Curated annotation (Swiss-Prot):
Organism this protein belongs to: Arabidopsis thaliana (Mouse-ear cress)
Location(s) in or outside the cell: Nucleus
InterPro entries, per the entry: TF_GRAS (IPR005202)
Name of the protein this chain belongs to: Scarecrow-like protein 27
Region named SAW: 568-639
Stretches the record annotates as Leucine repeat I (LRI): 266-331
Region described as Leucine repeat II (LRII): 438-470
Keyword check for Transferase: no
Gene Ontology CC annotations of this record: nucleus
Residues covered by region (Disordered): 68-98
Keyword annotations: Nucleus, Transcription, Transcription regulation
Region (PFYRE): 480-565
Amino acid sequence: MPLSFERFQGEGVFGLSSSSFYSDSQKIWSNQDKTEAKQEDLGYVVGGFLPEPTSVLDALRSPSPLASYSSTTTTLSSSHGGGGTTVTNTTVTAGDDNNNNKCSQMGLDDLDGVLSASSPGQEQSILRLIMDPGSAFGVFDPGFGFGSGSGPVSAPVSDNSNLLCNFPFQEITNPAEALINPSNHCLFYNPPLSPPAKRFNSGSLHQPVFPLSDPDPGHDPVRRQHQFQFPFYHNNQQQQFPSSSSSTAVAMVPVPSPGMAGDDQSVIIEQLFNAAELIGTTGNNNGDHTVLAQGILARLNHHLNTSSNHKSPFQRAASHIAEALLSLIHNESSPPLITPENLILRIAAYRSFSETSPFLQFVNFTANQSILESCNESGFDRIHIIDFDVGYGGQWSSLMQELASGVGGRRRNRASSLKLTVFAPPPSTVSDEFELRFTEENLKTFAGEVKIPFEIELLSVELLLNPAYWPLSLRSSEKEAIAVNLPVNSVASGYLPLILRFLKQLSPNIVVCSDRGCDRNDAPFPNAVIHSLQYHTSLLESLDANQNQDDSSIERFWVQPSIEKLLMKRHRWIERSPPWRILFTQCGFSPASLSQMAEAQAECLLQRNPVRGFHVEKRQSSLVMCWQRKELVTVSAWKC
């Protein structure tokens, strides 16, 4: 969705002066060591020149690592999705008459207005790109539990943001062994005791976010026997991925010729699998394997990009996977600095994705409904969200609107204020940090508009790697309800047990999880690559079915970066871990059933989508959104 950069020029993204935007010396927005050229690159947010942000690139540690710093703001958030054509007979379909009855009985006639794809027209604020009700960040009909309206509540301003650090830790070489013993209630390990800084203090630009040593030194992963079976839906049959008993076997696999790769999906799958297996040996400094993998991917990618003018979703997904694997070979772990214009394009792609696919709406509204139902009890003055994947913060706009609607007296028992604590990994570039601060300012602005008292605190997820520095004082009072948003792909699998143990001590009212079909930390890296191929093929199919003109920008600025991020994170923690649901159970959490209201809300949401092919399935205590019987995302709730 090409946007004119000039339309956003003027006073800046939020119409704030540079002095007010960066007045707080505690924030990471002044870097005296950067060159003037880099200042000019990031200085213009959208209009006037702003000081260069101090970032993780500054190797400075906080003089007071455990000092807390708070700030009042608002929230937005993110995800993926698609559009479709057929419906299964065994599940709830988008076009089911029963759904029409449910929606009518619940008084959901205004949902069309909420979910319309109306554009803000000539609005001159990037905030409107994200917060526009037409892009799934608006307000649900009150009957849905997401009412509109605002009360006479002001948004207090108190700054608090704790920045990130680079904190070494002791890795787990085999997390599965620790969980097999039933006496182990939760996998736990002790990292070094050097105190981590809370703030986004930093290291060097090229330092990995999580520096990991080889989890299996001296062992060549290419020689492992992988005998996993995976269904590949294109052929509607079980396929066994190649298993290599030696590096020679992998090296002997022929690279697909231009005449066969485009016609036989199994060949493409085989080559991607073999390349991924070879890439797993790069930690052992095996140059031969690197060269072999690079050759396979280069030739495969060249063919995929030149095979036809109109590529199928499978071909496009395979091409993105190949590009991501090549980036791993070249150690391109840090994305280049983004320009303000690219940032606008990424936000525009995010908005287009939310309008094109019901994915974001399904995740956000289902999670928020569960949070409201668990936290909306008499006596709670405030809801405290602990978020491990804030994105652009769009998830919380409807929640703030609902809280604002209760202030006027419609729902007097409802909490009237909101606090957000964001746990984020150390930004690997100035761009990551820039986006985080951009989101923070968006949230502050929106909280002021709906007049909801709202605080935000930014903490390093690395604080949770050492129990000695756990911020257990996050709960401010007994009248504060705590809800956790923990997408499965938001943290490295090796860190999940410690994070769950920390959350267990906080005793949250609810933990909400979203799980995409490609988040497979329990599979070896090559198999995880194929899972990602299958998942993103299905996602692109759903987007193609919508016939949206913005599909290319969505794919370039949203889907492709998602693939790169997924594979990079999975490759950094190459060792397999137990399925995440087992980890939750081992750490003392039990699944909580989602309500009938949440299920009916999801069904009506998909029913009103113009593309047929999406449907909702209820699997045990979870709700699953599928595209033509293929899982796109699952939302579940957990309690301790």
